[in-house]
A protein has these predicted regions:
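Extreme N-terminal starter segment of soluble prokaryotic enzymes
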Residues: 2-7
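Short beta-strand segments
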Residues: 10-11, 44, 102-106
Length: 319
């Protein structure tokens, strides 16, 4: 098991000059801020199937039968769909250790959503496609965190994606070390507040599932189901309302330890966040201060307080 999360990435986003026009789309956050904390596995599917750099632009063509094909824009009958599908079939089984994948938006091979579709006559259609390589990856690994470069400029989506990367990495490490009922229960306990912040209905559904762990003889089968449920919950970005519920829940742990002035101050800070007057870091910082003064083993174990390295500063941009 790697000592850092391994993240797949479209090669052009690393600065490699592999785009159809011979250029790249190097992303500063990815290559500067995030790079010290992950190991990248870059791939350009179009180069991987033997296409040159530079090369004519490719398009997704929706046929009259509804099939999606990948063809050259200047030669609509020159089809590379089978080559791309064959590459995906060979390559995707080798990336099971990945904790996430960052793909290039709008690409006919890598785009995650809203890729332009064309008809067979070359007329522009809806932005409703998914790149062939990414579509195959999403089908094979539905739990894998996948995000586009453009969407990572959104602070909420960026924070959510990075949190999912580190969650899946920790879960995969648990499996690599050898599964036990104790380790699975301890993992879930650590993630309770994080899950509650992301999706309350999912949190309520996964709890009884974990409570029935003793009924499972095959722990790996349980792991597969649990991974699916966990990552589906975390896919929902944490909302202000859910964050507020979690913060108030944590506040209750300090009811007896704090004096009336401290309790009132903490409540005002949480309500200030709920009203949008304060950033999420305001109540979190105060709660961490009280946790240092009044240690609680359960709270100290919670992933919610540090779902990824604090030095990434992802919550600084979340209001």
């Amino acid at each position: 098991m790697n000592n850092k999360p391994v993240v797949g990435i479209s090669g052009c986003l690393t600065g490699a000059a592999v785009r159809f026009d011979g250029g790249h789309k190097r992303m500063d956050f990815v290559m500067n801020s995030l790079a010290p904390w992950v190991d990248y596995k870059p791939i350009c599917p179009e180069v991987a199937i033997g296409l040159p750099v530079p090369r004519p632009a490719l398009r997704l063509i929706q046929t009259t039968c509804g099939d999606i094909r990948m063809r050259y824009s200047h030669a609509p009958h020159d089809d590379v769909t089978e080559r791309m599908n064959a590459f995906a079939d060979r390559f995707l089984p080798t990336i099971g250790e990945l904790a996430g994948f960052i793909v290039c938006a709008k690409s006919p091979s890598c785009g995650m959503e809203r890729v332009r579709l064309y008809d067979e006559k070359g007329n522009r259609g809806r932005k409703a496609g998914t790149g062939l390589f990414t579509a195959a990856m999403m089908d094979k690994y539905p739990w894998l965190p996948i995000e586009e470069d453009g969407r990572l400029h959104d602070p909420v989506l960026r924070e959510n994606f990075i949190a999912r990367i580190f969650a899946l990495y920790e879960l995969n490490a648990l499996r690599a070390q050898g599964l036990s009922r104790h380790s699975l229960l301890a993992f879930h306990s650590r993630y309770k507040l994080q899950l509650l912040a992301h999706h309350q209905a999912g949190y309520r559904e996964i709890g009884p599932f974990v409570a029935r762990l003793h009924e499972w003889d095959d722990l790996d089968a349980f792991f597969v189901r649990y991974r699916e449920k966990l990552m589906a919950i975390l896919r929902h970005p944490a909302s202000r309302k859910n964050h507020t519920n979690v913060l108030m829940h944590i506040q209750g742990y300090f009811h007896r330890a704090l004096n009336s002035r401290q309790r009132a101050e903490l409540r005002e800070v949480i309500l200030g966040y709920r009203a949008g007057r304060l950033p999420i870091l305001a109540p979190l910082t105060l709660l961490k201060h009280y946790l240092a003064e009044h240690p609680d083993d359960y709270l100290r174990s919670q992933n919610y307080f540090e779902p990824y390295p604090d030095t990434l500063g992802l919550r600084l941009a979340i209001t």
